[in-house]
Amino acid sequence: MTTIISVRRNGHVVIGGDGQATIGNTIMKGNVRKVRRLYYNDKVIAGFAGGTADAFTLFELFERKLESYQGHLVKAAVELAKDWRTDRRLRRLEALLAVADENASLIITGNGDVIQPEKDLIAIGSGGPYAQSAARALLENTNFSAREIVKKSLVIAGDICIYTNQFHTIEELTSTAEGY
């Protein structure tokens, strides 16, 4: 359980996440880095919601796909989703990935889904609905930067969701896509 949010605005794409890891109802760690840069020269940012070990496995597999497809985000995401859905070992992994590069923002699921959400706003995890609501309100009613919106959305989600804390990892790329 966690909160991962991605916002694209004014030539920037930002993904942020909290750092809480839980087992059942117990907080096991409060400073997990659920958002990281991937691929050559850190051209892709990715965040995960779900099992930590599963997510690190998926990060590694996704980075290999990015290398195989020369950094083409959509192709790498589709190929990862195919493998995730069809490979018996991978099917057991429970996580969602939010990934972005300068052109696209995607959600990758274990069901084989690769989704480019409307207006490139992604929110996943237990605190996702709270962060998404906050981000939409801020996008529609303020001139805040993508980074400010991600930060404020994570704070709001952390105040509401018991599986989200206030330790944040935030990564940013310059973007060519418009988003909100």
From Swiss-Prot:
Cell compartments where the protein resides: Cytoplasm
GO molecular function: metal ion binding; threonine-type endopeptidase activity
EC number, UniProt record: 3.4.25.2
Main location: cytoplasm
GO biological process, alphabetically ordered: proteolysis involved in protein catabolic process
Domain of life: Bacteria
Active site: residue positions: T2
PANTHER family in alphabetical order: ATP-DEPENDENT PROTEASE SUBUNIT HSLV (PTHR32194:SF0), METALLOPROTEASE TLDD (PTHR32194)
Function statement: Protease subunit of a proteasome-like degradation complex believed to be a general protein degrading machinery.
Descriptive protein name: ATP-dependent protease subunit HslV
Lineage per the UniProt record: Bacteria, Pseudomonadati, Pseudomonadota, Gammaproteobacteria, Candidatus Palibaumannia
